[in-house]
A protein has these predicted regions:
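Catalytic nucleophile-loop/oxyanion-hole region of alpha/beta-hydrolase
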Residues: 83-84, 90, 104-141, 265-269
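Primarily recognizes the serine-hydrolase "nucleophile elbow" in alpha/beta-hydrolase
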Residues: 125-195, 204, 209
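Short beta-strand element of the alpha/beta-hydrolase
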Residues: 66-76
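Short beta-strand/loop motif that positions the catalytic acidic residue
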Residues: 222-224, 228
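N-terminal cap/lid segment of alpha/beta-hydrolase-fold proteins
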Residues: 31-66
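Active-site glycine-rich loops that stabilize anionic/oxyanionic intermediates
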Residues: 75-80, 150
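Bacterial Sec-dependent N-terminal signal peptides
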Residues: 1-34
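C-terminal catalytic histidine-bearing segment of alpha/beta-hydrolase fold enzymes
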Residues: 55, 233, 237-240, 244-294
Length: 294
C-alpha cells in the first residue's frame, strides 16, 4: 500500500508516522538553556578489573521519600567506542521534567576488547541492577524505559526483545526488560543485510532485535533520518510493521534529509527530545507541558 507523507502526518490519538522537515521551521528553547543537573555515579557491575557505572540525573526536587519513573540511555559508537555523556543533555532535560534519567556505561571493543554480545549482556545487567535496587534508587520498577542511539539503540532494543545473553551469575528472576523504548537511529537488524553482521555472522539470530520481536514487546518510538546510510528507512518500517503485527505500539518519526547520528545537533536535538517527551508523557512517565520547545 502506498504511503503519502506530508511535512507532519499525525493520526488522531496515536502518532503512527511523522515526517519532520525543518526547511521553513525554526525551533527555539522554552528554557534559555537546559537546567544543569550534576550526575551521581554508582557502580552496577564489575568484571575483573573493569568497573561499569551508572550516571544518574535526578529531579531538582528529588526526595528519597518519593518514587520516580525512569529512563536509561545507552550511548552509540558501533559497540567500539563512545561515552555516556552522549545523552547528558537529554538526561538533564528529562530530570528537569521530573523523572530519573540514567546514562549507562558498558563494555566496548576499543577499551575492553569485547564483542557486541558482551555489550548486550552489560545493558541487561544495568537494567536488572536498576530494577533490583529500585527502592533504594527511589525508582518505580514498573516504569523503567530504555533508550539509545545507533549501537546504544540496539542495546535498548535488545533488552526489550532478545531472550538470553544474560549474565548467569545474576538473579535472573528479576527482569531486564524495559517497559518502553525510545530509539534514535537504532541498529535493529544484524542479519546478513543489516549492520554489524561481519562481527556477528551466523549468531545474528541471537542478537538481532528485528528477528526477535514477540508478543508483549515494549511500546517503542523510533526517530531516524531519511538519508541514514547505515540504517535504511525500509528496515525501521519493517520493524514497525512487525511490532504492530504482534500487537505492540511502535511510533516512527522520520527526519527529512538527515543522516546517521543527527539527533544531537541543534534543532534536531530539540525536536527529537520533544518527541521522546511526548511519547513518554503518553505512557504516563511525564506530566505537564514540555519545556524543550515553543
Amino acid at each position: 500500500m502506498a504511503k503519502v507523507f506530508k511535512d507532519i502526518w499525525l493520526i488522531p490519538k496515536l502518532v503512527l508516522v511523522t515526517l519532520v522537515s525543518f526547511s521553513c521551521v525554526h525551533l527555539t528553547y522554552c528554557q534559555e538553556k537546559i537546567i544543569t543537573v550534576e550526575a551521581e555515579t554508582i557502580e552496577y557491575k564489575r568484571i575483573d578489573t573493569i568497573s561499569l557505572n551508572l550516571h544518574i540525573y535526578k529531579p531538582l526536587n528529588f526526595s528519597n521519600d518519593s518514587t520516580y519513573n525512569c529512563i536509561v540511555f545507552f550511548h552509540g559508537g558501533g559497540w567500539n567506542n563512545g561515552h555516556p555523556n552522549a545523552f547528558k543533555r537529554q538526561s538533564m532535560y528529562l530530570a528537569s521534567r521530573g523523572i530519573i534519567a540514567i546514562s549507562a556505561e558498558y563494555r566496548i571493543k576499543n577499551k575492553h576488547n569485547t564483542t557486541p554480545f558482551e555489550s548486550v549482556e552489560d545493558a541487561k545487567s544495568a537494567m536488572r541492577y536498576i530494577r533490583k535496587h529500585a527502592r533504594k534508587l527511589s525508582i518505580n520498577p514498573n516504569m523503567i524505559a530504555a533508550g539509545g542511539g545507533s549501537a546504544g539503540g540496539h542495546l535498548a532494543a535488545a533488552c526489550g526483545n532478545i531472550i538470553g545473553l544474560e549474565n548467569p551469575n545474576e538473579d535472573l528472576s528479576i527482569s531486564s526488560v524495559p517497559n518502553a523504548l525510545a530509539l534514535l537511529n537504532p541498529v535493529i537488524d544484524n542479519g546478513p543485510d543489516g549492520y554489524g553482521y561481519q562481527r556477528i555472522k551466523e549468531r545474528y539470530l541471537e542478537i538481532s532485535p528485528i528477528h526477535n520481536i514477540t508478543n508483549g514487546a515494549p511500546p517503542t518510538i523510533i526517530l531516524i533520518g531519511t538519508k541514514d546510510k547505515l540504517i535504511p528507512v525500509s528496515t525501521v518500517e519493517t520493524y514497525k510493521d512487525n511490532m504492530e503485527t504482534m500487537g505492540s505500539r511502535c511510533d516512527l518519526v522520520l527526519y527529512k534529509n538527515q543522516e546517521h547520528a543527527f539527533f544531537n545537533k541543534g534543532e534536531y536535538f530539540i525536536d527529537t527530545t520533544y518527541q521522546i517527551d511526548r511519547f513518554l508523557k503518553s505512557l504516563g512517565y511525564l506530566k505537564g507541558p514540555n519545556t524543550i520547545k515553543k
